[in-house]
C-alpha cells in the first residue's frame, strides 16, 4: 500500500512538471508576429512616409514587446520597401503635363504682403535612369507680365516631399529651389495636383491647383499609369491663410 501511494505521488509530480513545461512552450509557440497588421497600424499612425528611426523603434518596442530581432528587421525592411514604392508611384503620377492656377505670395517694396495670380503649365518628365526624379519645364503666364519659361530639376524625397530646383536665369541669378513638403500636399493623384510650395533659398510661397493635361509614358511602358492611391499629407486643420507670411524677395518675386 505504501509503495502504491509513493508511486501515485511520483506520477502526479511528473504530470505537474509536464504541464508546466508544456504551458511555457505553448506560450512561445502561440506568439505570432503579423507583419501586415504591424505595417497597417504603423502607416495609419504616422502616414504614408512613416517617421524617424528612433520613434519607429520606440513604437515597435511598445506595441510588439515579444517580437524577435528578426521580426523587427523584417518590419523595417518592409517599411522601407513601402516608402520606396510610394516615392516611385508619386513620381509616376507627376510624370506628364499639369495645368491650372498658381497664386504667388511675396512682399512688395513697401513691405506689404501681396500676391500675383498666374496660369501655369508644369511639364514633368521622369528620368530614364531613376524612378523618383527627372527634368521639367514651367510655363507661367498672366496679362501684365506675359509668359515666362523656366526649366527645372525635380525629385520625390524619402519623406514624400517634392523638391524643385529651377535652372539659373541667363542674367546670372542663382537657381531658385522650391519644396512641396508632404504636409503641404493637399492631393496628388493621376488627375489632380494641389498644394503649397515653399521657397528654400528664397522667401516665397505658391498655392497651386492643377489638373493633368497630358500623361507622359515612361520609356518601355505601353500604357499610362493607372488610377490608384491618392497621396496627400495636409489635414484640414493644418491649412492657414498666408496673410501673415514674412516674405522678402529680391525684385519682388522670381
Short names for language-model regions:
Residues 1-22:
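Sec-dependent bacterial lipoprotein signal peptides
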Residues 17-66, 70-86, 207-215, 242:
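Bacterial Sec-dependent N-terminal signal peptides
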Residues 35-49, 66, 105, 138, ...:
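Calcium-binding acidic motifs and repeat modules
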Residues 76-84, 158-254:
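Beta-sheet ligand-binding and adhesion/scaffold domains
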Residues 80-99, 127-129:
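N-terminal helix-cap/turn-to-beta initiation motif at the start of protein domains
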Residues 99-107, 135-141, 165-169, 196-200:
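Generic short beta-strand segments
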Residues 109-161:
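N-terminal glycine/threonine-rich, aromatic-flanked beta-hairpin/loop signature
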Amino acid at each position: 500500500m505504501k509503495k502504491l501511494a509513493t508511486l501515485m505521488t511520483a506520477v502526479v509530480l511528473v504530470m505537474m512538471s509536464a504541464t508546466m513545461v508544456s504551458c511555457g512552450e505553448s506560450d512561445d509557440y502561440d506568439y505570432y508576429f503579423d507583419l501586415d497588421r504591424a505595417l497597417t497600424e504603423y502607416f495609419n499612425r504616422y502616414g504614408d512616409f512613416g517617421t524617424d528611426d528612433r520613434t519607429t523603434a520606440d513604437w515597435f518596442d511598445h506595441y510588439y514587446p515579444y517580437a524577435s530581432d528578426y521580426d523587427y528587421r523584417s518590419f523595417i525592411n518592409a517599411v522601407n520597401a513601402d516608402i520606396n514604392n510610394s516615392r516611385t508611384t508619386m513620381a509616376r503620377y507627376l510624370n506628364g503635363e499639369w495645368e491650372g492656377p498658381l497664386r504667388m505670395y511675396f512682399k512688395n517694396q513697401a513691405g506689404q504682403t501681396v500676391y500675383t495670380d498666374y496660369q501655369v503649365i508644369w511639364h514633368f518628365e521622369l528620368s530614364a535612369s531613376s524612378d523618383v526624379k527627372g527634368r521639367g519645364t514651367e510655363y507661367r503666364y498672366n496679362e501684365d507680365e506675359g509668359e515666362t519659361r523656366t526649366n527645372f530639376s525635380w525629385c520625390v524625397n524619402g519623406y514624400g516631399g517634392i523638391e524643385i530646383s529651377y535652372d539659373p536665369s541667363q542674367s546670372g541669378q542663382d537657381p531658385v529651389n522650391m519644396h512641396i513638403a508632404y504636409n503641404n500636399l493637399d492631393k496628388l493623384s493621376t488627375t489632380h495636383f494641389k498644394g503649397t510650395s515653399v521657397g528654400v533659398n528664397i522667401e516665397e510661397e505658391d498655392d497651386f491647383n492643377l489638373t493633368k493635361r497630358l500623361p507622359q509614358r515612361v520609356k518601355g511602358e505601353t500604357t499610362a499609369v493607372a488610377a490608384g492611391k491618392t497621396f496627400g499629407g495636409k489635414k484640414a486643420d493644418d491649412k492657414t491663410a498666408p496673410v501673415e507670411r514674412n516674405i522678402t524677395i529680391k525684385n519682388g518675386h522670381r
